C-alpha cells in the first residue's frame, strides 16, 4: 500500500511564501441577481441569487441574445444596489452611457469605472494592476470592511492578441 501524501508542509510553505494566497474552499457569501428569476435559479439553484461574487461567471450565446443587457445592465445595477463597485471593461467599444443610465446603471465615478480595451494583454494588465493595488490598500482590513468589486468584461470573445492585429 502506498504511503499517504502529506500535503501539510507544502500548504504551509505555499501560504507563507505567496502573500494573499489561500488554500481550501471559498464559498460565496454574496450573490448578484441577473434580474431573471429563471436565470438565477439555473445558475444558483435559488430564485433570488444569481451570480456568485468571487467566482468567474461567463455568459455565452448568439449575437443579439441579450448577454450585454443581462450583464452590463441587470447585473451591474443589482451589484451597485448592494454597494458593489463595478469595473466594466468594454472590448467592443459598444457600451453607451445614455443606454446604461436609461436602464438605471449609475455611471458616476463613485459607482463605476468603464475602461475600453481590445487586447488580451491589455485586459490582463488592467486586472492585474487593479488587483495588486486593491491588495496593497485593502488586504489588511477585515474581510467585511473591504470594498467589493465586480469585474465585467464585455465581451471576452472580441479580445485579440497582439500577433493577430
Task: Name the predicted role of every residue range.
Residues 110-118:
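Short acidic-hydrophobic, aromatic-tinged amphipathic segments that line or gate anion-handling sites
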Residues 2-110, 122-132, 136:
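The Walker A/P-loop phosphate-binding site
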Residues 136-143:
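Conserved ATP-binding/catalytic motifs of P-loop helicase motor domains
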Residues 164-165:
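Conserved small/polar residues in nucleotide/adenosyl-binding loops
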Residues 84-85, 146-150:
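Loop/turn-to-beta-strand initiation segments
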Residues 155:
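Walker B catalytic acidic pair
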Residues 158:
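Residues immediately C-terminal
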Amino acid at each position: 500500500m502506498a504511503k499517504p501524501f502529506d500535503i501539510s508542509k507544502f500548504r504551509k510553505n505555499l501560504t507563507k511564501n505567496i502573500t494573499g494566497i489561500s488554500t481550501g474552499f471559498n464559498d460565496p457569501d454574496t450573490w448578484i441577481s441577473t434580474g431573471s428569476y429563471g436565470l438565477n435559479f439555473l445558475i444558483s439553484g435559488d430564485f433570488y441569487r444569481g451570480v456568485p461574487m468571487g467566482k468567474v461567471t461567463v455568459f455565452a450565446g448568439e449575437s443579439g441574445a441579450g448577454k450585454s443587457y443581462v450583464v452590463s445592465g441587470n447585473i451591474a445595477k443589482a451589484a451597485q444596489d448592494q454597494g458593489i463597485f463595478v469595473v466594466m471593461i468594454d472590448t467592443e467599444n459598444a457600451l453607451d452611457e445614455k443606454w446604461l443610465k436609461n436602464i438605471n446603471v449609475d455611471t458616476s465615478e463613485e459607482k463605476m469605472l468603464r475602461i475600453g480595451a481590445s487586447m488580451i494583454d491589455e485586459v490582463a494588465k488592467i486586472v492585474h494592476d487593479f488587483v495588486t493595488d486593491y491588495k496593497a490598500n485593502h488586504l489588511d482590513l477585515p474581510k467585511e470592511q473591504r470594498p467589493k468589486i465586480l469585474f465585467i468584461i464585455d465581451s471576452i470573445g472580441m479580445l485579440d492578441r497582439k500577433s493577430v492585429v
